Amino acid sequence: MTFTVVGRCPKTKMLGVAMATHAPAVGNSCPVVIPRMAAASVQSIADPRLTLLCTKLMGLGYHAGKIIEELETSDPNAPLRQIGVVDAWGNAAAMTGSENGAYAGHILGDGWL
């Protein structure tokens, strides 16, 4: 089980990701932060190719919803994934695949998930 917070400070505009999980070394494969662009987590049977694509889309300035859409449509295993993104404008978007555990989901707020 993994708990993740992705957010943007409304005052400083800084972005960040925090994770708590049983899996070792997720910090090497799940979170992505590009300062002044976006922050994200690509998790639940993480695929490094998705993390790289997420990084590319963030760098191109895609908004959070479009990043989620692109990642979900490019991944044949999307039902196994959980992805969350907060962009530089404070937009939050997420998807939780249908094949995640019984206790899986996401909550979106203004500049956080």
Model regions: which residues?
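N-terminal nucleophile
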Residues: 1-113
